[in-house]
Amino acid sequence: SLLEFGKMILEETGKLAIPSYSSYGCYCGWGGKGTPKDATDRCCFVHDCCYGNLPDCNNKSKRYRYKKVNGAIVCEKGTSCENRICECDKAAAICFRQNLNTYSKKYMLYPDFLCKGELVC
């Protein structure tokens, strides 16, 4: 769920999901269109695509469990949906951490109308 995802983001990046990633660029937050603005925004695009591959799962509200083992996120065994959602969120949180050096405050609260075009997963 968004609760676990937010916790993962904080643990991996030291940033609060809201406001840091809730409306960043063209893809972080609800929906998305256009060309990702930077590597962090591309993390969100890939995360959206990952969720898009789980049409039968309630991605944003489905709770799951994970733990940290030697600093690494490990998704705990749950239902198929829980496991797959956790893996999508884990990949995004790690992607955010790997791209912290290019995170730019200018893309926070980025206006949707500046996001043009369509990308296909």
UniProtKB/Swiss-Prot annotation:
Residues at which Ca(2+) binds: 27, 29, 31, 48
Entry cofactors: Ca(2+)
Disulfide bonds: 26-115, 28-44, 43-95, 49-121, 50-88, 57-81, 75-86
EC numbers on record: 3.1.1.4
PROSITE patterns to which the protein is assigned, alphabetical: PA2_ASP, PA2_HIS
Keyword Nucleotide-binding assigned: no
Reactions listed under catalytic activity: a 1,2-diacyl-sn-glycero-3-phosphocholine + H2O = a 1-acyl-sn-glycero-3-phosphocholine + a fatty acid + H(+)
Enzyme category, top tier: hydrolase
Transmembrane segments: none
UniProt-listed SMART domains: PA2c (SM00085)
Annotated protein name in UniProt: Basic phospholipase A2 daboxin P
Species whose genome carries this gene: Daboia russelii
